[in-house]
């Protein structure tokens, strides 16, 4: 993970085809959760979001979808967006282009298995976002990998605020302040529904949701529409 709590504007300008923020005029913030679905953690996140009628985007690892399809199904049924986070949480800077792209496609396939079964019961069901929204693990992806995925129709979703909830060396309060000191309408915020991040996440997320609510901002999922 690239450890800027607030992504510098210069970095955002260097990669203009990647999505870093949304217009402030949306009056909304965009919470995102990487690395799930994980039992006990992802379901807890879903329940916390529901308390505020908040929607979010979950960048899922393919192997975790395979292990926990019921949780993945719940994400969709609760109205959240899902996106691709590779099949095995690959570091793009350490993976050749062919292997990286194949791993992304494997993750798509895991999501599509659920989608095809779901359509039998509900013809309107769709997880098109999962196939088209992509976040590189650690924020690390090469220019060539990026171009190939974009040609396949992927939107590469980055962020402007990193909670660093996964960092066990920082305090829960530091994690919270990483978010609160920089959040504005249009912000894309990174959390992790992972075992490693659980302690900081359970402390921080309810307080962030309360802060957003008191500001009168919406909490929206990222979608293609």
Where are these regions (language model features)?
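C-terminal domain-boundary segment and adjacent tail
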Residues: 15-25, 51-53, 64-66, 199-225
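CE4/NodB-like, metal-dependent polysaccharide N-deacetylase domain
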Residues: 46-55, 80-81, 97-143, 147-151, ...
């Amino acid at each position: 993970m690239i450890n800027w709590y607030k992504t510098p504007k210069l970095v955002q300008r260097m990669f203009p085809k990647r999505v870093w923020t949304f217009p402030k005029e949306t009056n909304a913030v965009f919470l995102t959760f990487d690395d799930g679905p994980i039992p006990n953690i992802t379901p807890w996140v879903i329940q916390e979001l529901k308390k505020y009628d908040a929607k979010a985007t979950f960048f899922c690892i393919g192997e975790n979808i395979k292990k926990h399809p019921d949780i993945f199904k719940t994400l969709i049924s609760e109205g959240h967006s899902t996106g691709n986070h590779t099949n095995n949480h690959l570091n793009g800077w350490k993976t050749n282009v062919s292997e990286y792209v194949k791993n992304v496609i494997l993750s798509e396939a895991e999501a599509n298995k659920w989608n095809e079964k779901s359509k039998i019961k509900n013809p309107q069901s769709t997880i098109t976002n999962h196939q088209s929204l992509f976040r590189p693990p650690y924020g690390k992806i090469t220019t060539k990998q990026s171009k190939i995925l974009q040609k396949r129709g992927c939107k590469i979703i980055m962020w402007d605020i990193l909670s660093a909830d996964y960092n066990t060396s920082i305090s829960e309060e530091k994690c919270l302040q990483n978010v609160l000191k920089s959040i504005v309408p249009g912000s894309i915020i990174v959390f992790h529904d992972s075992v490693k991040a659980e302690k900081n996440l359970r402390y921080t997320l309810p307080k962030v949701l309360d802060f957003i609510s008191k500001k009168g901002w919406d909490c929206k999922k990222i979608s293609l529409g």
